[in-house]
């Protein structure tokens, strides 16, 4: 998403009239232990990873805090997992095409309370590349598939769980969304499709 925003800004500023942005992730070839260690490097190496914390355990802390403040939302988390698997089932190129039920999620292999295996995203390989172009060029190249960018936002927050003001909201997401709404002149009620980062089902609920 940051590459997308930087590409958009580069075109809007007139520095470039066309850019290609991309992202690549290759993790499925390695062991679970190595991948877990690699992902955990995004957390605090001393006060979180140093005491054995992993991303599933850190997000489990977030989930339990959410339960404490707003009540148990395991049902909503399970529904999110079922929905995501149903979407994947419709895609012949999906990594895991398997329909599951709410009971499957709740009774799945435990990972970090309250998560079962179905609450956690898969370790995956993937890549995406997008061509961004100035409006006049995009219209000439492929007018039927050109998508206009109305708004964009970007914000940051601490990656540490202990450094956040609240564990039950994604502050950077809220700020970035507000920026995008303001820039586009649109509101949440006018959005028909949203793609969410769902590393764990609790993030989708939040």
Predicted segments, located by residue:
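Active-site-proximal alpha-helical scaffold in enzymes
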Residues: 1-25, 57-90, 130-136
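Conserved catalytic cysteine-centered active-site region
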Residues: 1-19, 26-58, 96-122, 157, ...
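Beta-strand segments within the central parallel beta-sheet cores of soluble alpha/beta enzyme folds
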Residues: 19-24, 75-82, 144-153, 188-197
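Short glycine/threonine-rich loop-to-helix capping motif typified by GTGT followed
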Residues: 161-166, 198-206
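Phosphate/pyrophosphate-binding loops at sites that engage ATP/ADP/AMP, CoA/4′-phosphopantetheine
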Residues: 67-71, 176-190
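Condensing-enzyme catalytic core mediating Claisen C-C bond formation in acyl metabolism
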Residues: 45, 78-79, 110-179, 183
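Stable alpha-helical structural segments in soluble proteins, enriched in small hydrophobic residues
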Residues: 3, 7, 11, 129, ...
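Metallocofactor- and cofactor-centric catalytic cores in central/energy metabolism, strongly enriched
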Residues: 5, 75, 87-91, 99-101, ...
């Amino acid at each position: 998403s940051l590459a997308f925003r930087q590409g958009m800004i580069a075109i809007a500023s007139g520095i470039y009239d066309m850019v290609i942005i991309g992202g690549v992730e290759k993790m499925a070839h390695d062991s679970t232990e190595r991948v877990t260690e690699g992902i955990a490097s995004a957390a605090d190496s001393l006060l979180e990873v140093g005491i054995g914390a992993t991303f599933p355990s850190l997000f489990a802390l977030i989930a339990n805090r959410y339960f404490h403040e707003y009540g148990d939302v395991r049902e909503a988390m399970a529904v999110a997992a079922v929905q995501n698997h149903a979407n994947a089932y419709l895609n012949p190129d999906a990594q895991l095409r398997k329909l599951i039920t709410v009971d499957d999620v709740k009774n799945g292999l435990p990972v970090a309370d309250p998560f079962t295996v179905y609450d956690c995203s898969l370790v995956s390989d993937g890549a995406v590349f997008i061509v961004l172009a100035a409006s006049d060029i995009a219209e000439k190249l492929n007018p039927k598939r050109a998508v206009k960018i109305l708004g964009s936002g970007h914000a940051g927050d601490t990656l540490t769980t202990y450094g956040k003001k609240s564990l039950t909201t994604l502050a950077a997401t809220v700020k970035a969304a507000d920026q995008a709404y303001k820039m586009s002149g649109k509101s949440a009620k006018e959005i028909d499709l949203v793609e969410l980062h769902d590393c764990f089902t609790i993030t989708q609920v939040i």
